[in-house]
Design a protein with these regions (language model features):
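Conserved non-catalytic scaffold segment of RNase H-like nuclease domains
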Residues: 1-104, 140-147
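P-loop/Walker A phosphate-binding loop and immediately adjacent motor/lid segment at beta-alpha junctions
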Residues: 103-111
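A structure-centric signal for secondary-structure junctions around beta-strands
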Residues: 18-20, 109, 170
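Short alpha-helix plus adjacent loop in nuclease-associated cores
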Residues: 113-133
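Acidic, Mg2+-coordinating catalytic module of metal-dependent nucleases/exonucleases
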Residues: 80-90, 95, 131-190
């Protein structure tokens, strides 16, 4: 079974542009990471505050490549995966769908799993209203599963040419991969 664990960093909150896409591909035989930075025409100040990527920095990191330059590779990887997994996956799928639509293409995938929603009844973090449970932030999920930042950094260095901190798509994609792996080992997830 081919599974992709992924995350995006974006130019803002409404589907604008993806400035970084990272994913871990697990196909039963091997695990590999892919990280892509993209040149973008703008980054909202609020987004830059979160991930630290300016238009100039992205131009350098991407080597001038735009999302459309890697569209075929991304389309193949995601459309051939049996499952794609992300934390608040609906957000990331929305941006991927938008990027594909800019090129008059359709973003295709078979099935998705949102780790944020799937782990809500497992983590059981109380809401401030004391009714039901709140969605765990990725950091809260890692803490619940006893996955530490150095675990994520070590795995990033094994899968990618570099490593970033929280709100770098490499970090978040690897964190989701490790969370699902650990949850399966603990029998919390099938």
């Amino acid at each position: 079974m081919k599974v992709i664990y992924f995350d995006t960093e974006t130019t803002g909150l409404t589907p604008g542009k993806i400035c970084q896409l990272s994913y871990v591909i697990e196909d039963g035989e091997r695990v590999q990471g892919k990280n892509m930075f993209f040149a973008v025409p703008f980054v909202e100040p609020s987004a830059q505050q979160v991930h630290g990527f300016s238009v100039e920095k992205l131009a350098t990191l991407s080597g001038g490549q735009r999302f459309c330059d890697r569209l075929d590779e991304i389309a193949f990887d995601f459309s051939t995966a049996d499952l794609i997994v992300g934390h608040n996956v609906k957000f990331d799928i929305g941006f991927l769908t938008a990027e594909f639509s800019y090129e008059y293409e359709t973003f295709r995938y078979k099935e998705s799993l949102c780790s944020m929603r799937a782990f809500t009844p497992i983590c059981r973090l109380p809401r401030t209203t004391h009714v039901g449970y709140k969605y765990p932030k990725l950091g809260e999920l890692l803490e619940f599963l006893e996955i530490y930042p150095y675990d994520v950094t070590r795995a990033q260095l094994q899968l990618f040419d570099g490593a970033g901190g929280a709100h770098d798509a490499r970090y978040d994609a690897v964190a989701v991969y490790l969370a699902l792996k650990k949850a399966k080992e603990k029998g919390l997830f099938a």
